[in-house]
Amino acid sequence: MDANFEMPPVGGMNDDDDMDFGDGASFLKVGEEKEIQQGLKKKLLKEGEGYETPENGDEVEVHYTGTLLDGTKFDSSRDRATPFKFTLGQGQVIKGWDIGIKTMKKGENAVFTIPAELAYGESGSPPTIPANATLQFDVELLKWDSVKDICKDGGVFKKILAVGEKWENPKDLDEVLVKFEAKLEDGTVVGKSDGVEFTVKDGHFCPALTKAVKTMKKGEKVLLTVKPQYGFGEKGKPASAGEGAVPPNATLEINLELVSWKTVSEVTDDNKVVKKVLKEGDGYERPNEGAVVKVKLIGKLQDGTVFLKKGHGENEEPFEFKTDEEQVVDGLDRAVMKMKKGEVALVTIDPEYAFGSNESQQELAVVPPNSTVTYEVDLLTFDKERESWDMNTEEKIEAASKKKEEGNSKFKGGKYSLASKRYEKAVKFIEYDTSFSEEEKKQAKALKVACNLNDAACKLKLKDYKQAEKLCTKVLELESTNVKALYRRAQAYMELSDLDLAEFDVKKALEIDPNNREVKLEQKRLKEKMKEFNKKEAKFYGNMFAKLSKE
């Protein structure tokens, strides 16, 4: 699943893990639909190979597209061109998946209609899936493999001695706490710890530990058989205090327990805002943009100097702010929107997302220029901004209008990125208008045109010319003679060096409004740019022919 969408389990391990649902569902004809159980339906689109189906514990690999019943797509591995992998029957996905995919053969393609009680139930999975939603998944089962050979090359075999809790596994950035004892095949102890903490990607002792912990759950105990390439290879390891030497090319046996771990995640794609969970929160909901949050905060410099402390004093009220309103530094704003209620996290923020290159006087100390800062954040409560599915049609139009006005205000203040977000949110409120009255559809259309046009202006300011072009095209699909859309798309085309397309839009705009001053100025700028381009092209071909004639 992608970074913004989670497929959490509903109710943990399945009660139906030992039951067989394959008799009917595995022998459907193409185009036939049948109920498997509890309202879960399967429709066969393409037959698979052979007769085998995956079992609990198998690691399956699928492509899927998930939609609501109205056709709204909320997630797709196909769009990412990356198959989705999970372990069947371990509660890593919704219950409907664990049941349904056990009925599939390799290469089979089917559509599963999954009722809410086998999906996300009454809570849904905001912001993409409403409460009590019946879902449809178009799933293709690509393959499945045994999980025992964890590196798929015979280098590390894993035998589970004690099953772990829940369904999560540590990731590369996480800090794990493990106990282990490593022996040679003759029983000689060559490594041992009753509790060592390390970052997964940095590893500890030998490469096999990193490989293994990424497949383990909290509290899981395993026996690893480790070949030399994941141990100490051709060089081996010299003896140390209380531990024997590892000879060259030795196979190891390691008893390993994953005691716990602290989840560390990248809040931003550039790894400049990182969040480490110190205490897990409750549920799956997180604050959205525009949510009102209440937190306890401690802000520190890298040397430990405390520059901010909120909500920790006796009888002191929690610190309250509204997300996505620049009321706190950008990195903190983004991190809080990744937290759950009750979660305590340590957020490390590079200067770019904190106070930048300027000195900043804070409550308890000065933050010097270009400072990396940390915040310990305790998210106490939050009130989310209402989502579109919680509104009737009148409220959706009203909310879209409000977001448009907020966007206009941000634009006038030169805050183009924030303005763009407001316009995008406005359009989302009214994107699906099938339930609108005719009058409401007219209002929604006018709002879509205005917001997409204004958003295009933001994208031009932000130099995101490709997105500006796409937004103008959306407007022209609604109003083919919209001069502003033609004008702004021409600007985008010029910056993208698509001069012929820019010329077409300018000419069309002037046909509609011959006296438009802005378009005329753009036409003049376009002619100058085309003249400059033609000169460069002539020079290029002149030099090329000169070289050819010399040869």
From Swiss-Prot:
Residues where N-acetylmethionine is found: M1
- Provide the tissue specificity: Expressed at low levels in roots, stems, leaves and flowers. Detected in the vascular elements of roots, in hydathodes and trichomes of leaves and in stigma, sepals, and anthers.
Q: Which UniProt keywords apply?
A: Acetylation, Calmodulin-binding, Chaperone, Cytoplasm, Isomerase, Nucleus, Repeat, Rotamase, TPR repeat
Could you tell me which SMART domains the record lists for this protein?
A: TPR
Conditions for induction: By wounding, NaCl and by heat shock.
Query: Where does the UniProt annotation locate this protein?
Result: Cytoplasm; Nucleus
Region of interest called Disordered, as start-end residue ranges on this chain? 1-24
Where is it mainly found? cytoplasm
Q: Where is this region: Calmodulin-binding?
A: 529-545
Q: Where is the PPIase FKBP-type domain?
A: 57-145, 173-262, 290-383
The reply to whether Chaperone figures as a keyword in the UniProt entry is yes
* Enzyme Commission code: 5.2.1.8
Q: Which InterPro entries match?
A: FKBP4/5/8-like, PPIase_dom_sf, PPIase_FKBP_dom, TPR-like_helical_dom_sf, TPR_rpt
Pfam families the UniProt entry points to: FKBP_C, TPR_1
The TPR repeats extend over: 400-433, 449-482, 483-516
Q: Which reaction does it catalyse?
A: [protein]-peptidylproline (omega=180) = [protein]-peptidylproline (omega=0)
Per the record, the similarity remark reads:
Belongs to the FKBP-type PPIase family.
Q: How does it assemble?
A: This PPIase probably binds calmodulin. Interacts with HSP90-1. Forms heterodimers with FKBP65/ROF2.
The protein depicted here goes by the name Peptidyl-prolyl cis-trans isomerase FKBP62
